[in-house]
Regions:
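Single-stranded nucleic acid-binding surfaces, predominantly the OB-fold ssDNA-binding core
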Residues: 1-125
């Protein structure tokens, strides 16, 4: 089976490092991708926002040492996951996110490629 998402876009906010209740660190990014069409001779832009969670330890460590600032151009490769939560009013909300967590998943800065993290070792051996 294959579940793979690839994005090239721009960060909508500075990267953020968080820690779970059990002490595991992960990073969050918001990435915008755009597509363009011409309608009646005028260019129209359509932007889609993507929530990205990074769990790969080497990439999280790399992000701890720097901030991917708002507006940074990035390449993201991960898997699509669908989540849900219930708000204070009991209303269910559904959303999708891109998760960078396993072999073959990666995050790269396209602004400064020389600073990119080393690829994660293949955890499947």
């Amino acid at each position: 089976m294959l579940n793979k998402a690839q994005l090239i876009g721009f960060t909508g906010a500075d990267s953020e490092i968080r820690t779970t209740l059990k002490g595991k660190k992960y990073a969050l990014l918001r990435v915008a991708t755009s597509r363009y069409t011409k309608k009646e001779g005028e260019r129209q832009d359509f932007t889609t926002w993507h929530q990205v969670e990074i769990w790969s330890p080497g990439t999280v460590k790399w992000l701890e040492g720097r901030v991917l600032a708002k507006g940074s151009k990035v390449y993201v490769e991960g898997e699509i996951r669908h989540e849900q939560y219930t708000d204070d009013k009991g209303q269910k909300h559904y959303f999708a996110k891109i998760v960078v967590a396993g072999p073959g998943h990666e995050l790269k800065s396209l602004d400064r490629p020389e600073t990119n993290p080393e690829p994660e070792p293949d955890e499947e051996g």
